[in-house]
Amino acid sequence: MNVRDEGKTTAEKHGGGEENKSPENKWRFNSPLAQVSLMGFVCFCCPGMFNALSGMGGGGQVDPTAANNANTAVYTAFTVFGLLGGGFYNVLGPRLTLAAGCSTYVLYAGSFLYYNHHHHQAFAIVAGALLGCGAGLLWAGEGAVMTSYPPPHRKGTYIALFWSIFNLGGVIGGLIPFILNYQRSSAASVNDSTYIAFMCFMFAGVLLSFGILPATSVIRNDGSRCSAVKYSRPSTEAAAVLRLFLDRKMLLIVPAAWASNFFYSYQFNNVNGLLFNLRTRGFNNVFYWGAQMAGSIAIGYVMDFSFKSRRARGFTGISLVAVIGTIIWAGGLANQHGYSLDKLPEKKLDFKDSGIEFAGPFVLYMSYGLLDAMYQSMVYWLIGALADDSQTLSRYSGFYKGVQSAGAAVAWQVDTRKVPLMSQLIVNWSLTTVSYPLLVLLVYFYVKNDNDDDSNDKV
């Protein structure tokens, strides 16, 4: 049976009629493809550029302390608003939620432009706290769109599409400091033009967010609609979010959520930041985020097409990420034996001048990006397999991002307090390793095959 025939069957299950007829125009603004793609470009402009800025190590500054403290503020606030973001999304709808979230990214980049001249941390820390609030809103909206708008049997493909567009922002964001600081091979911090360019992209993200449609306006190619959401009162949403702490499905995801951003401070500050000079950090980030695009596409294919059984695809995806993750972290262990905070490299690596010495750390850093995308895309696929309506999934995504941010807030302070680099690496490796068997249990007990019941036909 082809895809079109499947769509007709789905429509018939829900009564047929005009509402469930397949749209004649497959290239529509209200299609899941257009909406997920637009969501990708919103994140391209805002968190994509934020990732590129963070990936410079220390926010592009010679001393990472201000950036570490600002990031701690970001993720502390994100912990709260990540949990509540689904409630805001369900009350405000996608456009207001996303626009409010995106606007805080512009302020954050502007705070580092200010810091470039005045070296006062207060503005960066306050802007970081506001960004944490905004990021909670943005990612709750993103999670609902990405996991509930696509058809159930193609969620991995749409996650890969989103992740590729989103991480293209990191690629372009890596090119910005690389190009604007190319002739400054001995510079310690990026110039003003770099921060201004980031701010322009982030403001574009604010404008794009107004194009995201509510779930009830999105029509799939088979004529089915996404689950209609009856927006709830804040008190109702607060109670629903609190109940997630007793939800066994969410408890099994907690270690993966905690681990999924914990390693950023180590990778950005202590691999890219300590081993490479300024312009090479931007060069490296192009490939770090480019590898994320490849990783998301690869794992998306596995999670959607490797086996007919959804559960088998889940087990296969987790196993593949576990094997690749073990290999990459083992490579990181070998690399970490070469330096420490007490014994830093005498000269930082340059992509043009360091020759073969540059290759090993560069490939490792790029591999970290590959693993990050595979790991997070896998977890998002699992979350998407637990439900099909945007209200539930916005809460699940908000819970995931909230726990993720709590871990990141701790990680940035771990780095600020100069914890030995080898200890940081071992903790990062251990956290991801612990999460794999728990995700296997999640699939075993709570992920159902497409034909187990009719829940996956919900429209």
From Swiss-Prot:
Taxonomy-wise, where does this protein's organism fall, top ranks first? Eukaryota, Viridiplantae, Streptophyta, Embryophyta, Tracheophyta
Membrane-traversing stretches:
38-58, 73-93, 96-116, 122-142, 159-179, 195-215, 251-271, 287-307, 314-334, 355-375, 425-445
Q: Where in the cell is it found?
A: Membrane
User: Which source organism?
Assistant: Arabidopsis thaliana (Mouse-ear cress)
Name by which UniProt lists this protein: UNC93-like protein 1
CDD domains of this UniProt entry?
A: MFS_unc93-like
Q: Which InterPro entries match?
A: Ion_channel_UNC-93, MFS_trans_sf, UNC-93-like_regulator
UniProtKB keywords: Membrane, Transmembrane, Transmembrane helix
What does the similarity note say? Belongs to the unc-93 family.
One Gene Ontology cellular component annotation held by this UniProt entry: membrane
List the residue ranges of the region (Disordered).
Answer: 1-26
Keyword Nucleotidyltransferase, does the record have it?
Answer: no
